[in-house]
Design a protein with these regions (language model features):
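N-terminal catalytic cores of NTP/NDP-binding nucleotidyl/phosphoryl-transfer enzymes
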Residues: 24-94, 100, 123-138, 244-245, ...
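Helix-rich, typically C-terminal accessory recognition domains appended to large enzymatic cores
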Residues: 79, 144-145, 149-156, 410-441, ...
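Flexible, glycine/threonine-enriched loop-and-boundary segments that flank and lead into catalytic domains
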Residues: 214-241, 288-317, 321, 419, ...
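Conserved oxyanion/phosphate-binding beta-strand-loop segments in alpha/beta enzyme cores
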Residues: 1-36, 66-75, 99-106, 279-323, ...
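Residue patterns forming the tRNA-binding/recognition surfaces of aminoacyl-tRNA synthetases
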Residues: 2, 11, 18-19, 91-248, ...
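Basic, alpha-helical terminal appendages of large translation-related enzymes
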Residues: 1-32, 259-262, 271-275, 355-372, ...
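Long, charged, mostly alpha-helical binding arms that flank functional sites
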Residues: 3, 224-229, 237, 362-365, ...
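NTP-handling and nucleic-acid-processing catalytic cores
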Residues: 3-13, 49, 135-362, 468, ...
Length: 835
């Protein structure tokens, strides 16, 4: 019978819809397993092939766990607030709510089309007022605990989205969402004090099973360092303070630099003789993003503050002060000391402005470049009492001296900044606060939540940078919940990251009207046992959700300090590059491609995009080859954690494998158990597939199944052999497996159970190695046949078995065996001569 994948997949998807085999049961006595993937943003384009990679992997893990006797929670939802939907709605003149529901409907269809074992009764949607009621409730708890505050500050402003971006949302000077340039603006913003949790966010990484690159990225982003704050005297009434991790280099300080935003500059306006020049520089710096002022800032610019003198506390010498935009007000004290002999950025600045360069750690040639050691073994020179010490010895010695002299003290510093939490857009959760002229900011009473996002006539962007909600005067104007006076609602909305910072908790108890999650459900399901997601979310969603979870732990909502016990990540799937030089034959054509597309022309695979025409739509793949083929290929494509390239030919190869499994059903004998001949390959494959799924080596698990099928075609197979194959293949290709399971009578054998409801096969270690082996027999180098002998038989046993062979006996008749060449378990060669 033909493998009609379309009919088979519809049949089983309809059945799963009816019987709900993926429903998780809170409080069940089975051990629990909570497997989580990052819920998708429901874009208008629908699923792309990047989605099925993590979704399929976690589905396989959860299916195996279910078969191993676990009560599995494998949920799905939609992270539906945010800029893309709003921008699409503005462009197409459709309300974002309508767009969102259309997109969710399409995503749901596609997810079910791929056969994912989600618990569809637990779906969450961040735009549902019954969901964001609790997002607002959590924000109010943050506000009540002084972890949410409003302040005027320089912020990242996307010139296209016309809204504020968090530092984490700016990538290489542009908006990570739309790619438009990001500039700096002064705006009043709601902030969350994530910095209060900086130490715990770093220290608690030791208690979780995250892949190392995730831990490293989070540690680097938080950027904790222990150093020294040093006070420098000036010729004004103000001292300045500098933070440094290399207090040992103080003798090498030849200048200082202040941030353009530092408040001291305004205070010194009457002292600075070239104020007009400084003010113009400040204005230019204000138009740049932090990235432009940092990583992109190759040319060192600045203005010397004429009239300001700074005294180096180590040497007593006067050094100049500059204002330069490479110093950011948000890190350290907003003032840095310049040690050009041992910092390349400082060296470049000193060269640009003709400043002295002093060597204080010997070993390099500071006339050519700064000398920067990667370790602390360098020897101090030109450093007074530190001379002759190693850097390792000099740092504590200088720190002790600075403390004793009263101009220094130890300080722990962080790169992490508080989270910019408000957005001047429409499509987000309303911030449930009211601004009263008498009472200040007052929370909306909890019993009035959710504060529902109102319908607006125009949700398009305002040129003045205010939220579209600001035009809704009937909604904005309200009464103060505290004193009853006239007041105004906050019109900014929450960022997209708000709803995703706690969604994993709502999955545990999605229909609870009284609290975000009950203690019963959270105690049972928490923490998430395995969370897989993209590396691009490591310093955004993953960090934010850990922060919110720790806060919820502090106020008694959850019982675990960390939300996720395990975190893994997956590689991106690339598309074929239509502009690759390998696609053309002549050098002239290759040169033309390089001239037009640069380095991109040298890469055979690139990120999929509509403009390149290399986007792969899962709908098309499923229509042509079936959902099981799509699932199988997306796992067979390569190392799960690394980038992989889509190949239509390789998809066809996975379809051929499933065809072979389908056709293999006709060759199954009535022998019920695992056959003796296939026992080694069956038990070895069970061991391999079990271990590989647990370690995300899905491609090698599939390769092992393919090898086993090859053996079955060579050896023949029993019902027991086929049963083992179907059970192992079930997580990868569930539709086809259930059809074969039913057709071959296994469902009847197990009282109507589907394959997915049966126990995962177990292996016997002793049977993973064959008890006998087939060996080739040669007589004087000529092949005479094969023999079956026990594994690791000695030479005498092998020779006797060979001599018992009819062909060998005939070949050595009348001959004398003068030598035996024995390759254990492989070959025996009898060297003979006439008697």
């Amino acid at each position: 019978m033909k493998y009609d994948f379309a009919a088979i997949e519809k049949k089983w998807q309809d059945k799963w819809e009816q019987v709900k085999p993926y429903a998780a049961v809170t409080g069940d006595k089975r051990p629990k397993f909570y497997g989580l993937i990052e819920f998708p943003y429901p874009s208008a384009a629908g699923l792309h092939v990047g989605h099925p990679r993590p979704f399929t992997a976690m589905d396989i893990i959860c299916r195996k766990k279910r078969m191993q006797g676990y009560n599995v929670l494998n949920p799905i939802g939609f992270d539906a607030f945010g800029l893309p939907t709003e921008n699409f709605a503005i462009k197409n003149h459709i309300h974002p709510a309508i767009v969102t529901q259309q997109n969710i409907k399409n995503f749901t269809r596609q997810l079910k089309m791929l056969g994912y074992g989600f618990d569809w009764d637990r779906v969450v949607d961040t735009t549902d007022p019954q969901y964001y009621k609790w997002t607002q409730w959590i924000f109010l708890q943050l506000f009540k605990h002084d972890l949410a505050y409003k302040t005027t500050m320089p912020v990242n402003w996307c010139t296209s989205c016309k809204c504020v971006l968090a530092n984490e949302e700016v990538v290489e000077g542009v908006c990570e969402r739309c790619g438009a340039p990001v500039i700096r603006k002064e705006k009043s913003q709601w902030m969350l004090r994530i910095t209060k949790y900086a130490d715990r966010l770093i220290d608690d990484l030791d208690d979780v099973d995250y892949i190392e690159r995730v831990k490293t990225q989070q540690r680097n982003w938080i950027g904790r360092s222990t150093g020294t704050e040093v006070t420098f005297k000036t010729n004004t009434e103000d001292d300045i303070t500098v933070y440094t991790t290399r207090v040992d280099t103080l003798f090498g300080v030849t200048y200082t630099v202040i941030s353009p935003e530092h408040p001291l500059l305004k205070k010194w306006k009457g002292i600075i003789k070239n104020w007009d020049e400084v003010e113009a520089y400040q204005a230019a710096a204000a138009r740049k993003s932090d990235f432009e002022r940092g990583e992109l800032n190759k040319d060192k610019t600045g203005v010397r503050l004429d009239g300001i003198e700074v005294i180096n506390p180590a040497t007593g010498k006067v050094v100049p002060m500059f204002v330069s935009d490479y110093v950011l007000m948000g890190y350290g004290t907003g003032i840095v000391m310049g040690v050009p002999g041992h910092d390349q950025r400082d060296w470049d600045f000193a060269k640009a402005f003709g400043l002295p360069i002093v060597e204080v750690v010997e070993g390099g040639d500071i006339t050519k470049e700064a000398f920067t050691l990667k370790d602390d073994t360098g020897i101090m020179v030109n450093s007074g009492f530190l001379n002759g010490m190693t850097v390792k010895e000099a740092i504590p010695a200088m720190k002790k001296y600075a403390v004793e002299q009263g101009w220094g003290h130890e300080k722990v510093n962080y790169k992490l900044r508080d989270w910019v939490f408000s957005r001047q857009r429409y499509w987000g959760e309303p911030i449930p606060l009211v601004n009263c002229p008498k009472c200040g900011w007052v929370p909306v009473p909890e019993e009035e939540l959710p504060l529902v996002l109102p319908q607006v006539d125009s949700y398009e962007l305002t040129d003045d940078g205010k939220s579209p909600l600001s035009k809704m005067t009937d909604w904005v104007n309200t009464k103060c919940p505290k004193c009853g006076c006239d007041a105004k609602r906050e019109t900014d909305t929450m960022p997209q990251w708000a709803g995703s910072s706690w969604y994993f908790l709502r999955y545990m108890d999605p229909h609870n009207d009284h609290e975000p999650v009950s203690h019963e459900a959270e105690n049972y399901w928490g923490p998430v046992d395995w969370y897989n997601g993209g590396m691009e979310h490591t310093t955004l969603h993953l960090l934010y959700s850990r922060f919110w979870h720790k806060f919820l732990y502090d106020i008694g909502v959850v019982h675990t300090k960390e939300p996720y016990a395990k975190r893994t990540s997956h590689g991106m799937i690339l598309g074929q590059n239509p502009h690759y030089v390998g696609n053309v034959s002549t050098q002239e054509e290759k040169d033309a491609l390089i001239a037009k597309y640069g380095n991109q022309a040298l890469r055979p695979a690139v990120k999929m995009s509509k403009s390149l025409g290399n986007v792969v739509n899962p709908d098309d793949v499923v229509k042509a080859y079936g959902a099981d083929t799509m699932r199988l290929y997306i796992m067979f494509i390569g190392d799960f954690e690394k980038v992989a390239t889509w190949s239509d030919d390789a998809v066809k190869g996975c379809k051929r494998f499933l065809d072979r499994v389908w056709n293999l059903a006709d060759q199954v004998t009535e022998e019920d158990g695992v056959s003796e001949k296939n026992a080694p390959i069956v038990h070895k494959t069970i061991k391999k597939v079990t271990d590989d799924i647990d370690t995300l080596k899905m491609n090698t698990a599939i390769a092992a199944l393919m090898a086993m099928v090859n053996e079955f075609y060579s050896n023949g197979l029993s019902r027991g052999d086929f049963e083992a194959l179907l059970l192992m293949l079930s997580p990868f290709a569930p539709h086809m497996v259930e059809e074969l399971w039913e057709q071959k009578g296994f469902a009847a054998k197990y009282e109507g159970k589907m394959a997915m409801q049966c126990a995962w096969p177990e292996y016997d270690e002793s049977k993973t190695v064959a008890s006998s082996v087939e060996m080739a027999v040669q007589v004087s180098g000529k092949f005479k046949g094969t023999i079956i002998v026990p594994v690791d038989s000695d030479q005498d046993t092998v020779v006797e078995a060979a001599k018992a062979s009819e062909k060998v006996a005939k070949a050595i008749a009348g001959m004398q065996i003068v030598k035996v060449i024995h390759v254990k378990n492989k070959l025996v060669n009898l060297i003979v001569k006439p008697c």
